[in-house]
Amino acid sequence: MDIERKWRDRWRDAGIFQADPDDREKIFLTVAYPYPSGAMHIGHGRTYTVPDVYARFKRMQGYNVLFPMAWHVTGAPVIGIARRIQRKDPWTLKIYREVHRVPEDELERFSDPEYIVEYFSREYRSVMEDMGYSIDWRREFKTTDPTYSRFIQWQIRKLRDLGLVRKGAHPVKYCPECENPVGDHDLLEGEGVAINQLTLLKFKLGDSYLVAATFRPETIYGATNLWLNPDEDYVRVETGGEEWIISRAAVDNLSHQKLDLKVSGDVNPGDLIGMCVENPVTGQEHPILPASFVDPEYATGVVFSVPAHAPADFIALEDLRTDHELLERYGLEDVVADIEPVNVIAVDGYGEFPAAEVIEKFGVRNQEDPRLEDATGELYKIEHARGVMSSHIPVYGGMKVSEAREVIADELKDQGLADEMYEFAERPVICRCGGRCVVRVMEDQWFMKYSDDAWKDLAHRCLDGMKIIPEEVRANFEYYIDWLNDWACSRRIGLGTRLPWDERWIIEPLTDSTIYMAYYTIAHRLREMDAGEMDDEFFDAIFLDDSGTFEDLREEFRYWYPLDWRLSAKDLIGNHLTFHIFHHSAIFPESGWPRGAVVFGMGLLEGNKMSSSKGNVILLRDAIEKHGADVVRLFLMSSAEPWQDFDWRESEVIGTRRRIEWFREFGERVSGILDGRPVLSEVTPAEPESFIGRWMMGQLNQRIREATRALESFQTRKAVQEALYLLKKDVDHYLKRVEGRVDDEVKSVLANVLHAWIRLMAPFIPYTAEEMWERYGGEGFVAEAPWPDFSDDAESRDVQVAEEMVQNTVRDIQEIMKILGSTPERVHIYTSPKWKWDVLRVAAEVGKLDMGSIMGRVSAEGIHDNMKEVAEFVRRIIRDLGKSEVTVIDEYSVLMDASDYIESEVGARVVIHSKPDYDPENKAVNAVPLKPAIYLE
């Protein structure tokens, strides 16, 4: 921890991460700024470490890198949290005491929502600094800052001027606790859950209506009965001049859509069982039957039954027919016996009652059978895609189901026989404040017109010009650009920016976080300016115009823009990341559109999903205190690629710590070999003559090359594999090969390895790298040192092949010794004769493994007199070598160079033969290129 504090202080004092325009090529990257309503956990750690590694890497490559940070405090969830804390809600207090570890004296101040975000903004910054993030903190801001609010008002006025903001009514996710619409960003549970529209069909019962919700209004012609749950509570409500009967649980949701809805009394559902209602379309009477499967919290708690086409209704009727106790209790024996399914949809391949057929097909036994859901899903899809209304249906007979559904629903609503409501596709949907969300139809609401076709075209053009990592999620962006409908962009309460033309409203969090990357470019320069003077002309002059005013601000913006990389989580593709594309494409010219996006996977903790609300998290501060920042960073970068889900496992984190300890120990080992600490600033390029020295430098070149290419595409796991794990394996092998040697070549090679390796690891473990860089005589900060060079045409291939041959030869000798069960006095190794290399060359030049073609060329060139031997060898080439690339090496020189090592590995004297001058058992004939023959004596 002392080392970490030391380097944080030095970085800060030197200001090395403060980025200002200069003559270098720039890199500008941002990651989603956090919503500081809780403590930072290890999932956040991965999110913010990826861009820091990339920023450090590009900085070392010589780029001018801007990596800023800010705090997204807009929204209502924090107000809900403050209210719950104010009223001493036990669950909320427990979470903030035990999970977020807020001291009691601080928690007492959490009844103020602004203090909550102030507290956690400080906490976040402190932890980010502890993690060693190379952030330009001069540009830090909160989304409630007056200057930022003026910027956001400029943005939304621009969009309104373009006709991309409208007013109207629209169903939205809504938190009654916060009294506000909510987006996915505001949710603890239910992110990405869609809002479905259902048709409400009114079945008359006396002076009231039982109102049943359905996705399939066209099946009203096949209704046979209604279902109620006799064990739940039902009520009478008044709305639109009518009296409806619905479940009590449905009131919470429906009252936010029918704003005049009032409860007028209780209804005992048991009293309704056996009574009949009137079908709003056919006028037929249908009995009300009991059903425990009816969920009172879904829609209205009233279901109409179509047993010919709904497998659940068919099987429910069958189950009821055999429940004699229930039938007797309500006197329903004759009623149920008389019910017959009514066909209303014709589908090729199915008979009169398709529901019965799919139940038999799937082997569904009763209502509890899990296969019922599969049967239902299959039939609904088939009838929607291929079904037509049966010919006996008035007016609509022969019409496609997919068309009839909408037409029938609209006509019934026009006649007052139906209505509509909205419901979540899945439940529960829980706000960050802990409140249960409903669907609310917002009147007098402001919307972003993402439905606008011309705007969608612009967004597609913007996306087409972007790099997307990983590329396979591009299809997700394309889908959401097409799928997005109008978006409620304002709220009644919460922290944030007032809508400039209607100050009753506050701009919601996703709308105010789409182009803030542009604000970063000038944020530090606006700090001392008067927000009141920042009108639209001010921001136009900076971001859009060529006028002479505010030239210094405009030049700073133009230096950094466009944004090179935007990084965020994959669950934000459907909103924030796609909104980011929409807004840039509308406001900025094409030259200012974003260039790339990187999408993150999610985080697991010991195999389970992380959740602050459920206490299943490890705070990042705790992980740093236990393991150190470098260990945390390295594990997060090496456990999975950024777009993959990662799993924090304590045992693997401990293993990561050991790798860093080994890295430090390597530095000390090199110091010992060099008879004192190396001076890295004085290291000159190694030029080894030995094959193993050339091999080590070739491997180092390869690891640098592959790590560099991986980092260019944000493949942090692959980069760590190359830069640490595989290079460590190479170094271990080299040290073993040169064991006992301390000559100048070994010293030079190891000094070069250490010099490159510290720089190679600096983006991942900056504290360790800085300490080692200083300890071993590096110049300045390693964070500013040049990234190690590599060459694409290095001689690494032939030395790699040479070393592989040495290792294979050692293994072959050891295998023979194991079979013989004894250690020989001498090991004779016979290299391949020149003619076999020539034949191999011919085979490669011929380009096809054809016996005749190869033999013809060999004969024509007179390579070898004994054509029988040639034929045997060619057959072996065809069998074993395939189309492998031919790399020619001097086997004799390589093996002679490695003879001491081979002797140490096999424990016997080694004799290398380039000719079979001593070959008592005629082994030399078995030698082929890269696979010497062996004789033990």
Curated annotation (Swiss-Prot):
Annotated GO CC locations: cytoplasm
Chain ranges for the short sequence motif 'HIGH' region as given in the UniProt record: 34-44
Keywords: Aminoacyl-tRNA synthetase, ATP-binding, Cytoplasm, Ligase, Nucleotide-binding, Protein biosynthesis
Domain of life: Archaea
Catalysis performed (reactions): tRNA(Leu) + L-leucine + ATP = L-leucyl-tRNA(Leu) + AMP + diphosphate
Subcellular location: Cytoplasm
One GO BP: leucyl-tRNA aminoacylation
The enzyme's E.C. designation: 6.1.1.4
InterPro entries in the cross-refs: aa-tRNA-synth_I_CS, aa-tRNA-synth_Ia, Leu-tRNA-lgase_arc, Leu-tRNA-synth_Ia_arc/euk, M/V/L/I-tRNA-synth_anticd-bd, Rossmann-like_a/b/a_fold, tRNAsynth_Ia_anticodon-bd, Val/Leu/Ile-tRNA-synth_edit
Keyword Amino-acid biosynthesis among record annotations: no
Motif ('KMSKS' region): 609-613
An example Gene Ontology molecular-function term: aminoacyl-tRNA deacylase activity
Similarity comment: Belongs to the class-I aminoacyl-tRNA synthetase family.
Name assigned to this protein: Leucine--tRNA ligase
Source organism: Methanothermobacter thermautotrophicus (strain ATCC 29096 / DSM 1053 / JCM 10044 / NBRC 100330 / Delta H) (Methanobacterium thermoautotrophicum)
